[in-house]
């Protein structure tokens, strides 16, 4: 039985894979046949399991040291700021009806979603990906109109700080709550605070399946303090901030309905 699944690739990586697939004589054959040609290792793993293992290995090798370094530098701020656990509704009366996650995929322009939303009477939560925030605010979708307004960053790279440098973000920053991964760059954190935002920390799950030897377990224990006796909430990310925001919407904020715009997870043929 075939299995369908999704994973995130940069466009440059996809192009390299297409070229390599053609060079190996698999241009007109399925992706499954190509993957099986070099993943066949006499184990009982499915193709899906093999790919997940390979991409996990690549991710850990590329980012593990950076996660540890960023976490250690963030620890003082984590202990002094908010845990995203504080955002969990305490009573049924606190439960909002819906949330809308906003990404920056090309479909958001194709379907004119920002203009439609800015003119709407939507009363639910706004959950912006960091990359979409400036354009969302410029489109008139601001915390002045949409009161329950969040932005999220999970990526570890220092370049994410540029997403918070637009002057319009500082204009509205003190009305926006930022959901930030404990492994985010401290430089990104500084830009977020300069914009006037309150930070609510989370853990992003990467290796929790490894038990007490995992980075997730160790960092989870280290963030349990008198102020945060239960530590930080931890979420699966799906490998990107849009999926992370969607998961955060129903696991932490407890929304029963979470909509998506600008979350494409792919490329148009043109």
Residue ranges of model-derived segments:
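N-terminal donor/sugar-recognition subdomains of glycan-related enzymes
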Residues: 1-125, 135-148, 159, 165-175, ...
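Small-side-chain structural scaffolding
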Residues: 99, 103, 128-129, 153, ...
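Gly/Ser/Thr-rich loops at beta-strand to alpha-helix junctions
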Residues: 104-108, 132-134, 185, 239-242, ...
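Active-site-proximal structural scaffolding
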Residues: 129, 171-172, 181, 242, ...
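Short, acidic/turn-prone active-site loops that include or flank metal/cofactor-
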Residues: 130-133, 151-160, 182-184, 203-208
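Glycine-rich phosphate/pyrophosphate-binding loops
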Residues: 133, 139-143, 147-155, 252-270
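Active-site/ligand-binding-proximal alpha/beta "capping" segment
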Residues: 186-257
